[in-house]
Amino acid sequence: MGQKVNPTGLRVGIIRDWEAKWYAEKDFAAYLNEDLRIRKYIEQRLADASVSTVEIERAANRVNISIHTAKPGMVIGKGGSEVEALRKELNNLTGKRVHINIIEIKKPDLDAKLVGESIARQLEGRVAFRRAMRGAMQRTMRSGAKGIKTQVAGRLNGADMSRVEAYSDGTVPLHTLRADIDYSWVEARTTYGKLGVKTWIYRGEILPEKKSAKGGN
């Protein structure tokens, strides 16, 4: 089962939390659609800012958005001008009061989304896929990862027939639920068509906190 299912969704509620934190009964569809529009807008607006994750929380008429990025300076701008402009744009998009929190990604080479985007951008720049994949894997392992697996599918090097190529280094225990595995899927738009880039990064185990013993001596 661990080989097929999305590793992130499999671990939600165990070692992962939801990226959307709100509850609604009647307005669920409207909130979900609004979340999709917010994520799409941020992804397009900050396409060059190495944004990995967008977390959304809701409270009454307020939306709190946490943006995880490897380039916080680019998102914030000089004197906070860029993030303030983004906040106003999202206010207009949602019709609600929006608060934005910027969280820096200290080690971008351990983030599957950013590693996948790096490979995709190289493929779009006509770099050989094996070179792009192995280079990304070496950087990730040097950054302290326990294992990494990358997979590229499509018309590789402009071949007439599409195929799948995968490489791995270290261990990636997909069945172990306490294993901290980051996963991403990114598209590369090349002159020969789209290529799908999948990345799995194993960053070690997250052990559940032990409950303190009651009535200890």
From Swiss-Prot:
<dbReference type="GO" id="GO:0022627">
    <property type="term" value="C:cytosolic small ribosomal subunit"/>
</dbReference>
<dbReference type="InterPro" id="IPR036419">
    <property type="entry name" value="Ribosomal_S3_C_sf"/>
</dbReference>
<dbReference type="InterPro" id="IPR018280">
    <property type="entry name" value="Ribosomal_uS3_CS"/>
</dbReference>
<comment type="function">
    <text>Binds the lower part of the 30S subunit head. Binds mRNA in the 70S ribosome, positioning it for translation.</text>
</comment>
<dbReference type="Pfam" id="PF00189">
    <property type="entry name" value="Ribosomal_S3_C"/>
</dbReference>
<dbReference type="InterPro" id="IPR004087">
    <property type="entry name" value="KH_dom"/>
</dbReference>
<dbReference type="InterPro" id="IPR001351">
    <property type="entry name" value="Ribosomal_uS3_C"/>
</dbReference>
<dbReference type="InterPro" id="IPR004044">
    <property type="entry name" value="KH_dom_type_2"/>
</dbReference>
<dbReference type="GO" id="GO:0006412">
    <property type="term" value="P:translation"/>
</dbReference>
<keyword id="KW-0689">Ribosomal protein</keyword>
<dbReference type="Pfam" id="PF07650">
    <property type="entry name" value="KH_2"/>
</dbReference>
<dbReference type="InterPro" id="IPR009019">
    <property type="entry name" value="KH_sf_prok-type"/>
</dbReference>
<dbReference type="InterPro" id="IPR015946">
    <property type="entry name" value="KH_dom-like_a/b"/>
</dbReference>
<comment type="similarity">
    <text>Belongs to the universal ribosomal protein uS3 family.</text>
</comment>
<feature type="domain" description="KH type-2">
    <location>
        <begin position="38"/>
        <end position="106"/>
    </location>
</feature>
<protein>
    <recommendedName>
        <fullName>Small ribosomal subunit protein uS3</fullName>
    </recommendedName>
</protein>
<dbReference type="InterPro" id="IPR005704">
    <property type="entry name" value="Ribosomal_uS3_bac-typ"/>
</dbReference>
<keyword id="KW-0694">RNA-binding</keyword>
<keyword id="KW-0699">rRNA-binding</keyword>
<dbReference type="GO" id="GO:0003735">
    <property type="term" value="F:structural constituent of ribosome"/>
</dbReference>
<comment type="subunit">
    <text>Part of the 30S ribosomal subunit. Forms a tight complex with proteins S10 and S14.</text>
</comment>
<keyword id="KW-0687">Ribonucleoprotein</keyword>
<dbReference type="GO" id="GO:0003729">
    <property type="term" value="F:mRNA binding"/>
</dbReference>
<dbReference type="GO" id="GO:0019843">
    <property type="term" value="F:rRNA binding"/>
</dbReference>
